[in-house]
Structure formats: structure tokens, C-alpha cells
UniProtKB/Swiss-Prot annotation:
UniProt-listed CDD domains: AdoMet_MTases
UniProt-recorded name of the protein: Pre-miRNA 5'-monophosphate methyltransferase
Top EC class of this enzyme: transferase
Subcellular location: Cytoplasm
Protein role: O-methyltransferase that specifically monomethylates 5'-monophosphate of cytoplasmic histidyl tRNA (tRNA(His)), acting as a capping enzyme by protecting tRNA(His) from cleavage by DICER1. Also able, with less efficiently, to methylate the 5' monophosphate of a subset of pre-miRNAs, acting as a negative regulator of miRNA processing. The 5' monophosphate of pre-miRNAs is recognized by DICER1 and is required for pre-miRNAs processing: methylation at this position reduces the processing of pre-miRNAs by DICER1.
UniProt similarity note: Belongs to the methyltransferase superfamily.
This protein's record includes keyword Nucleotide-binding: no
Length: 255
């Protein structure tokens, strides 16, 4: 799919791209936020150079942001007053394939100067290049400090297959220095396929042909860490939905 505007308006129970219209009513942001240490920024990111009179902002990319509830919760969590890094300005670019969800996210955005929303298909490299590059260029940067990929990998995998998942993770790794991933376990794949069948919808093109299956947290870790591309540095436990939060540091190798 090359155009995010072509996302069909489907029964809320189907949502073949994970674009559930009321997603946060049954999976509230607190399910993830409660697992993340309040000092995440302070521990991960470099401090501004003492000789630099300006504070280097922290840039975050949230892929598959839905209506933005989790994006806002992450922003609040990373800038909360008791954090030692709360004086570091934080700017988020948040994207989703569904234009209706992005419209709702923009309408309810409490921090329009710090959180930006864009409708885009993350698998369309030409579509991504514009808004992503434009955002980074505002800060004279080539990568984000951190990217968030929260309950997105399954939808990429089901719609684009094994190679699509590998390509997606590689693309994200190229865009950031740290990557926080919340993979859906394999049982969620079966549930997603079953929902489509119950609604009389066509099954996911790749569901039955996937060879990457089983322990998806382990599979995604293997994909990201292959050939030293990234290092798994922390596992923040499991959410109430039995989903792991995996933090990777992307390894930049000199040419």
C-alpha cells in the first residue's frame, strides 16, 4: 500500500492495520508507562556539553500512534517535573497510517509545540522521507534519539510478511539511536486472524505462510541484533497483556 489515504474504513473489530478507533479504551497507556523508569532520559541520553549554551533537544519518533494517547503519556513521562532530565526539551513526531486517527490526535493534542502528528505509511519509503526528514532538519539532526514501536510489529508482519518485518525493523533502526519495541506475542496473531474470519473478511495475505513465528520477542531481538546492528540493553517486564517492552541501543559502525 503506497498511500496512507487509501486505508479502508472497516468494522472496528477488524482493523487490519491495527487502526482500532477506540484502542486506548481497552489498552490504556498506563499499561506501558507503569513499566518504564521515570529516569529513562537521564540514564540513556547524553548530557548537554557544558560549553554549549543551548540544551540539545531529545527527539522521539512514535510509529503507529493511533489517536496519540500513548504518545502524550510518553511525552509527559519523559518530561515530568521530578525527572532529573525534565529540563531537556523533548519533541515527538508521531505517525499512523489512518488519517482519521491522526485527525483526532491533532484535535486533542495538548502540546502542539512539542508533539507533531503525521499521516503516513511507514512501509512506503518515499512517503516517509518527506515528513521524517522535514522534522529532523528542524533540529539539524539525521536521527531520532529514540523511536517507539508499541504493538505495531504484528500488523507489519501480517500485512507484509517475514521480509516486510525484517525491512521495517531495519528501517526503524536506521532512524534512531535507541528503539523501544513492544512486540505482540504469537497468540495475538491467531486472534487477529480469527477476528477477520468471524467478520467475513479476507484473511491476512501472509498469515499462513509466515516462517517467523513462536516467541516473537525473541525473534525480533534476533532480527535487530543480527550482525551487531543493535544491542538489547533492557527488558522492562511484561504488560498486563503479556507483552514485553524491549529497549535496544542501535550500534553505529564507522564506514
Amino acid at each position: 500500500m503506497s498511500n496512507s489515504e487509501s486505508v479502508p474504513h472497516v468494522d472496528p473489530g477488524a482493523a487490519p492495520y491495527g487502526n482500532f478507533p477506540n484502542y486506548y479504551s481497552f489498552n490504556p497507556p498506563e499499561n506501558r508507562i507503569s513499566l518504564l523508569p521515570a529516569e529513562l532520559l537521564h540514564k540513556l541520553f547524553r548530557k548537554p556539553a557544558e560549553s554549549d549554551s543551548s540544551t540539545q533537544p531529545l527527539l522521539g519518533l512514535d510509529v503507529g500512534c493511533n489517536t496519540g494517547d500513548l504518545s502524550v503519556a510518553l511525552y509527559n513521562h519523559l518530561t515530568e517535573p521530578h525527572s532529573k532530565s525534565s529540563d531537556v526539551p523533548v519533541h515527538f513526531l508521531c505517525c499512523d497510517i489512518d488519517p482519521d486517527l491522526i485527525t483526532r490526535a491533532r484535535a486533542s493534542n495538548p502540546f502542539p509545540d512539542f508533539i507533531s502528528y503525521a499521516t503516513l505509511d511507514i512501509m512506503d519509503s518515499s512517503a516517509v522521507r518527506g515528513p521524517v526528514n522535514d522534522f529532523l532538519q528542524q533540529f539539524a539532526r539525521s536521527t531520532f534519539d529514540i523511536a517507539f514501536c508499541m504493538s505495531v510489529t504484528m500488523w507489519i508482519h501480517l500485512n507484509y510478511g517475514d521480509q516486510g518485518l525484517v525491512t521495517f525493523l531495519g528501517h526503524l533502526a536506521n532512524l534512531c539511536d535507541y528503539l523501544l519495541v513492544e512486540p505482540q506475542p504469537w497468540k495475538c496473531y491467531r486472534s487477529a486472524a480469527r477476528r477477520l474470519r468471524k467478520l467475513g473478511r479476507q484473511d491476512f495475505d501472509h498469515f499462513h505462510s509466515l516462517s517467523i513465528r513462536g516467541d516473537m520477542a525473541e525473534n525480533i531481538t534476533q532480527i535487530l541484533t543480527a550482525e551487531g546492528a543493535a544491542k538489547l540493553i533492557h527488558i522492562f517486564g511484561n504488560t498486563s497483556w503479556d507483552r514485553s517492552l524491549l529497549l535496544f541501543k542501535i550500534q553505529r559502525h564507522p564506514c
